[in-house]
Design a protein with these regions (language model features):
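Glycine- and acidic
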Residues: 5-11, 38-43, 204-209, 258, ...
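Conserved phosphate-binding loops in nucleotide/dinucleotide-binding enzymes
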Residues: 86-90, 185-186, 204-216, 243-276, ...
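Active-site cores that bind ATP or allylic diphosphates and position pyrophosphate for catalysis
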Residues: 102, 109-238, 244-251, 259, ...
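N-terminal Rossmann-like or analogous alpha/beta NTP/dinucleotide-binding catalytic cores
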Residues: 1-128, 217-231
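Generic recognition of stable, solvent-exposed alpha-helical segments in well-folded globular domains
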Residues: 52, 56, 95-98, 217-221, ...
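Small-residue-rich helix-loop
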Residues: 330-435
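Structural motif
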Residues: 15-17, 263-271, 307-313, 346-356, ...
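Hydrophobic, well-ordered secondary-structure elements that form the walls
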Residues: 446
Length: 451
């Protein structure tokens, strides 16, 4: 059997770190078993649709090297590749309608005849009686014939407790309280997530569904629908939340969470981001900290994913990034730095910039650090004249005399090929002899212009 996994984001905004980690785990499971990694766009929530979000999702996955086998094409998402499309849910309406009609014919679904006002009356009554509102308590005895423009609801056939084996969490179970007659097709003719993802996963022959632990509570109603449709569920794996640095809540924007796009613009390498995200909730049981994508594919398994939330630590990401920067060849690093050089370096000679980069490589933590670490290689340093004017001995020299001393000093220092304390000391002694100046004058000037 071919292992087939899917990542199914919604184009409703930027793709946050939790989603990207899910995409990574989904990708690794497929690649570890020489399987297929599917990208499906769940775009049925048109009210929250954000223009350009899909393109950003595709570009993020591409930058991280999470190449997909089926789904929208990178340069033109409207074009798709794969034998199980369409891969946009809004293009799969006919498929959902076919399944909906099948369910109606089998007595598994019914048209919802109630107005929102009528439903609110039901809710208010349940609240007044201090009981949970359940739609199944208000099933119409003779529902109208369903047609587009009317919501269609699942008629849950059996109210019972469900148990299942989760590939990450182990044995789980949840009871009847989660089961109700949920909507399959909305009034706008588009399916709900609860319905569409089950149909899509079945039609696309998905074998593993990897998603966040927030979906555990809804799993019984999914299992109820699988059972009603006589579909064998795929292997389910619910991964823990990424937690805020405090460790007591889910990571959010208020905790400094950024999008992958923001981290990319700050000079985080894709290798470091993958390395970091993989270890947010997973380890291979060793002390190894640096993992290439190939090593992750080789070593990753769902049974090594932890059950509890993983604490977000941005400083660790930055540390990993520094390690990856130091591992790159000079040519590779140079090619990645093109948009990060300071303005003063834009027109500098390439060979000179590479020499500068070689000196800075071990000190870079992010590519964004490049300008502040290298700017002085491209601009003449400004001499603080106030320091000179405040020195009693240097005030005795004219501007021309100071410039001549600096010129001679520079010439002598440029002759040094082996920079050691001894060679520097010898150079300074030679300068004293050449210029005839006292140490107090010459060394004070050298200290000021090199500080």
């Amino acid at each position: 059997m071919t292992i087939r996994t899917r990542f199914a984001p919604s184009p409703t905004g930027y793709i946050h770190l939790g989603n990207v980690r899910t995409a990574l785990y989904t990708y690794l499971v497929a690649r570890a078993h020489q399987g297929d990694f599917i990208l499906r766009i769940e775009d049925t929530d048109q009210a929250r649709f954000v223009e350009g979000a899909e393109e950003m999702i595709l570009e993020t996955l591409n930058w991280l090297g999470l190449n997909w086998d089926e789904g929208p094409t990178l340069n033109n998402p409207k074009e798709e590749s794969g034998n199980f499309g369409p891969y946009h849910q809004t293009d799969r309406r006919d498929i959902y309608i076919k399944w909906a009609k099948k369910m109606i014919s089998e007595g598994l679904a019914y048209a919802d005849p109630y107005t929102p006002e009528e439903v609110q009356v039901f809710r208010d009554k349940a609240k007044a009686e201090k009981r949970a509102f359940l739609y199944r308590d208000h099933r119409p005895e003779n529902p109208p014939e369903w047609q587009l423009g009317m919501p269609l609801r699942f008629k849950v056939p059996e109210i019972k407790r469900y148990s299942w084996e989760d590939a990450v969490m182990g044995e789980l179970s949840a009871g009847p309280e989660a089961l109700d007659d949920f909507i399959l097709i909305k009034a706008d003719g588009l399916p709900t997530y609860n319905f569409a993802h089950i149909i899509d996963d079945f039609e696309m022959q998905v074998t593993h569904v990897i998603r966040g632990s927030e979906y555990i509570a809804s799993t019984p109603k999914y299992l109820s629908l699988y059972e009603a449709l006589k579909i064998t569920p795929p292997i389910l794996a619910h991964v823990p939340h990424i937690m805020a640095p405090s460790g007591n809540k889910k990571l959010g924007k208020r905790d400094g969470a950024k999008s992958v796009t923001e981290y990319r613009s700050e000079g985080i390498l894709p290798e470091a981001m993958l390395n970091f995200l993989a270890q947010l909730g997973w380890n291979d049981g060793t002390e190894q900290e640096i993992f290439s994508k190939a090593e992750l594919i080789e070593k990753f398994s769902l049974d090594r994913v932890q059950k509890s939330g993983a604490r977000f630590d941005e400083q660790r990401l930055i540390w990993l990034n520094g390690q990856w920067i130091r591992s790159l060849s000079l040519d590779d690093l140079y090619s990645r730095c093109q948009s990060f050089w300071g303005e003063e370096a834009k027109n500098a000679d390439e060979s000179y910039k590479k020499r500068v980069l070689e000196l800075a490589q071990d000190r870079l933590k992010t590519l964004q650090d490049l300008p502040k670490l290298t700017s002085y290689f491209f601009v003449e340093p400004e001499i603080d004249t106030e320091l000179i004017d405040g020195n009693k001995q240097l005030r005795k020299l004219t501007d021309d005399e100071r410039q001549e001393l600096l010129s001679i000093t520079r010439q002598e220092f440029e002759k040094i090929t082996d920079w050691t304390p001894e060679t520097i000391q010898n150079c300074l002694n030679q300068l004293l002899e050449t210029t005839g100046q006292r140490p107090g004058i010459l060394f004070s000037l050298v200290r000021i212009v090199t500080r």
